[in-house]
């Protein structure tokens, strides 16, 4: 594993991969851990007025469902009512009542978080997602559960007590909340403070309780492959290079297509090894390559005014100047 980003967080990568990676939970205190999403950024997101469900959710671990209308409001746009916009006053009220604020897929709508996620994904060759949690002291947003991902927790504010338990005992384990009758040995008990980083291996059961103030942390989930990912990749590998018509016409043509597909699959199976399948599945699981940052509207406007792209259609500024010249000329003739 090579990852400059992780090296900044956990120190020596070889030591981390040999001792902790997918083996053991651990807490690190990097010299300078600055989560890209914190309480100031959260306030800015609310100030912008566009934060809404499904990116916004409030949760409790005590099986009490927090209804959407308890923390959102509606807006009327062009005569149509739209629901699900974040309401800060309602959110704070729910926080005071013990609920946790959960922001999903922060990397999709906050550029600095998206840049961190893209960098980490490229370094690790894994799909990465970002979630933000805000929990009051004594509050617990999620019951003890297992994630289908390795998780890095970046503590941004307040304090939170974490309990991490054993990995699944069975190979065919289930993600999500643990059944009431399942017991799992505790492996780590630690209070995180701002600047701390917690690593939770994939599948290790865990829960967290607010310890002091409003606890804020950013969770980065590092996804890995499932059996379905491998099956999908295998199907794609077996079908690769097939030039059969998409819609065979008639029963004879359909039967011929069956025979051809089976023959091609047998030939391809002889050339595909486990490593080939693994690489194909990993490649398919990654998000599309991040494009170069798109041209901004300000850049477009500057190019428009200076003879760049779009000069065939004058912008509003040039239209205004033309109108003023015509008006001045008309006045001069009278």
Please annotate each region the language model reported:
Residues 1-7, 180-191, 207-334:
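Fe(II)/2-oxoglutarate
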Residues 1-19, 32-196, 204, 209-244, ...:
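Active-site region of the double-stranded beta-helix
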């Amino acid at each position: 594993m090579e990852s400059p980003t992780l090296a900044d967080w956990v120190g020596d990568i070889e030591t981390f991969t040999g001792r902790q990676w997918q083996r053991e939970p651990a807490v690190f205190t990097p010299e300078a851990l600055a989560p890209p999403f914190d309480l100031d950024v959260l306030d800015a997101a609310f100030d912008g007025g566009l934060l809404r469900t499904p990116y916004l959710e409030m949760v409790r671990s005590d099986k009490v469902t927090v209804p959407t209308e308890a923390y959102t409001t509606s807006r009327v746009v062009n005569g149509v009512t739209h629901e699900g916009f974040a309401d800060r006053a309602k959110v704070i009220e729910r926080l005071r009542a013990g609920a946790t604020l959960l922001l999903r897929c922060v990397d999709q709508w906050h550029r600095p978080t998206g840049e961190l996620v893209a960098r980490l994904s490229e370094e690790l060759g894994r799909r990465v997602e970002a979630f933000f949690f805000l929990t009051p002291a004594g509050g617990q947003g999620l019951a003890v559960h297992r994630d289908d991902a390795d998780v890095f927790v970046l503590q941004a504010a307040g304090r939170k007590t974490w309990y991490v338990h054993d990995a699944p005992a069975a190979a065919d384990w289930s993600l999500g909340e643990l059944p009431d009758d399942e017991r799992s040995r505790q492996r780590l008990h630690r209070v995180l403070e701002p600047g701390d980083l917690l690593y939770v291996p994939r599948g290790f059961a865990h829960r967290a309780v607010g310890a002091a103030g409003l606890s804020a942390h950013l969770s980065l989930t590092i996804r890995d492959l499932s059996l379905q990912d491998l099956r999908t990749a295998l199907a794609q590998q077996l079908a690769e290079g097939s030039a059969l018509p998409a819609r065979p016409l008639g029963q004879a043509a359909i039967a011929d297509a069956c025979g051809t597909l089976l023959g091609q699959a047998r030939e391809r199976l002889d050339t595909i090894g486990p490593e080939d399948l693994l690489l194909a599945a990993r490649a398919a699981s990654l998000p599309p390559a991040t494009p170069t940052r798109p041209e901004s509207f300000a850049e477009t406007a500057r190019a428009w005014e200076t003879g760049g792209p779009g000069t065939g259609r004058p912008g509003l500024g040039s239209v205004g100047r033309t109108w003023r010249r015509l008006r001045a000329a008309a006045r001069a003739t009278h």
